[in-house]
């Protein structure tokens, strides 16, 4: 799937959200053209990075070269609410690109695995008021990763718990904790390290483009 296709779909989805807010008269959304463009770019970057899988789990989930970081950077610059919105849109796109397999487990599983899980990327903006941007971003990354982990844990426990015995686990809870932790922990570490090393420069670049 070409990069321009991801950008186009992102723009269409964000545009639809803006139109919906405009009809409702919600002036707080403030999705400017620059913000829309930056959101589309971040979604495209995350989508491309998500295709580079360093390790793929058998039942979904993978370790990538920080595919969530562009979404987290957007949340850190534009705020938690905007970050959550972008995460939901990205989650819908990921569901489409993954072929819609999660739909076989029901709507709730689909929501937990995609829109809700990636909406947690918005939590990366929780510490944006800190003076030290590297630390603030790193803390936000940890919180966002934990939020996504919780969504995946609940989904794995409730909807995929029947696979526990297949992988040698007695308890579906322990199975979900271990399974989702196996890819989320390394993914989080990669994102935190990059945030600590390059976060300050990346945030400044995004803020300059946002002006």
Label for each model-derived stretch:
Residues 1-211:
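Loop-helix junctions at membrane interfaces
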